[in-house]
Amino acid sequence: MNPMSWLIITTSIALSTTMITSTTHWLMTWACLEINTLSMVPLISKPNHPRATEAATKYYLIQTMASTSMLFAATTNALNTSNWETHLTTEPMATTIITLALMMKMAAAPFHSWLPSVSQGTTTLTTLTILTWQKIAPLTILLTTHNKTNITLILLSAMLSITMGGLGSLNQTQLRKLMAFSSIAHTGWIMATITMAPKISTLTFTIYIMTTIPTFLLINTTMSMTIKDLGTMWTNSPYTMTILSMTILSMGGLPPLSGFMPKWLILNNLISMNMITEATLMAMASLLSLYVYMRLTYMSSMTLSPHTTTMPLKWRTSNKKHPMGTSMLTMMTMLLLPLSPNM
């Protein structure tokens, strides 16, 4: 890609997301979302492969459909209330449509099926952008309108996202698809308390980004595409695989790693709100994802069953150095639990 085009696209993505966090007008919010979508399409289709083109088309159609629904709901609310302010959206039907549209943008269940195929069709770093940065804008809008959002709708989507994220990842061998289902499950945890305790949801999203970024950077460094590729890396770089294993366990929410903090706070908040059934179902559904993380850890840090290698092992011909930022993020994914806030 031309360096000037790359600069314009990345600047547009960064500025559109930043402007959404600071605007209070629905038309401005919609315009920023459209700029963000149009800027992501060239990045997704950059590999110049039929799968990348298919992924870019799917992403564009889903995001445009969600933005159009949100604009329709905002217009309906403006006709009935004579205001375009995001935090003054009072029409129940408009609020519900906006919530569903934002759930579609975040790939929350039941609107999650597009994310794995889009993630598999593009590069590892572009997938990282879709799973982290692209969730900031819809999450910001949800946080702005959280006091008007239907709590039942949010909780149902959260429980369904955690369940579908775990079930979908059970039979996956491709790492990008597996991480996409992991993102769907984490989206459920982020949304679980967004109406009752938005600060906990913000903390959950922050921890999610801190665990996802080093995982993707390490996968990109080793150029692993499947779970089998991870198993062949152990003899070449045991330090990298050890750090990757700990980061994956942190994503699973195992104590005493940092990933345990948000789940602990969310379950504690739900129980304090007398939502014991919902908390129990979410905790049980998260065991599906935990099984997948344990399988990944076993494959990446211990052993592979005897097999014939039918593809060239990439680590034989490449030796990449790990940037300092990756090391710092991996340490944060393991050591932040003692700093848990009292929420």
From Swiss-Prot:
<feature type="transmembrane region" description="Helical">
    <location>
        <begin position="59"/>
        <end position="81"/>
    </location>
</feature>
<dbReference type="InterPro" id="IPR001750">
    <property type="entry name" value="ND/Mrp_TM"/>
</dbReference>
<feature type="transmembrane region" description="Helical">
    <location>
        <begin position="96"/>
        <end position="116"/>
    </location>
</feature>
<keyword id="KW-0999">Mitochondrion inner membrane</keyword>
<dbReference type="GO" id="GO:0008137">
    <property type="term" value="F:NADH dehydrogenase (ubiquinone) activity"/>
</dbReference>
<protein>
    <recommendedName>
        <fullName>NADH-ubiquinone oxidoreductase chain 2</fullName>
        <ecNumber>7.1.1.2</ecNumber>
    </recommendedName>
</protein>
<dbReference type="GO" id="GO:0005743">
    <property type="term" value="C:mitochondrial inner membrane"/>
</dbReference>
<comment type="similarity">
    <text>Belongs to the complex I subunit 2 family.</text>
</comment>
<feature type="transmembrane region" description="Helical">
    <location>
        <begin position="241"/>
        <end position="261"/>
    </location>
</feature>
<keyword id="KW-0496">Mitochondrion</keyword>
<feature type="transmembrane region" description="Helical">
    <location>
        <begin position="178"/>
        <end position="198"/>
    </location>
</feature>
<feature type="transmembrane region" description="Helical">
    <location>
        <begin position="200"/>
        <end position="220"/>
    </location>
</feature>
<feature type="transmembrane region" description="Helical">
    <location>
        <begin position="1"/>
        <end position="21"/>
    </location>
</feature>
<comment type="function">
    <text>Core subunit of the mitochondrial membrane respiratory chain NADH dehydrogenase (Complex I) that is believed to belong to the minimal assembly required for catalysis. Complex I functions in the transfer of electrons from NADH to the respiratory chain. The immediate electron acceptor for the enzyme is believed to be ubiquinone.</text>
</comment>
<keyword id="KW-0813">Transport</keyword>
<keyword id="KW-0249">Electron transport</keyword>
<keyword id="KW-1133">Transmembrane helix</keyword>
<keyword id="KW-0830">Ubiquinone</keyword>
<dbReference type="Pfam" id="PF00361">
    <property type="entry name" value="Proton_antipo_M"/>
</dbReference>
<dbReference type="GO" id="GO:0006120">
    <property type="term" value="P:mitochondrial electron transport, NADH to ubiquinone"/>
</dbReference>
<keyword id="KW-0520">NAD</keyword>
<feature type="transmembrane region" description="Helical">
    <location>
        <begin position="150"/>
        <end position="170"/>
    </location>
</feature>
<keyword id="KW-1278">Translocase</keyword>
<dbReference type="InterPro" id="IPR003917">
    <property type="entry name" value="NADH_UbQ_OxRdtase_chain2"/>
</dbReference>
<keyword id="KW-0679">Respiratory chain</keyword>
<dbReference type="InterPro" id="IPR050175">
    <property type="entry name" value="Complex_I_Subunit_2"/>
</dbReference>
<dbReference type="Pfam" id="PF06444">
    <property type="entry name" value="NADH_dehy_S2_C"/>
</dbReference>
<keyword id="KW-0812">Transmembrane</keyword>
<dbReference type="InterPro" id="IPR010933">
    <property type="entry name" value="NADH_DH_su2_C"/>
</dbReference>
<feature type="transmembrane region" description="Helical">
    <location>
        <begin position="270"/>
        <end position="290"/>
    </location>
</feature>
<keyword id="KW-0472">Membrane</keyword>
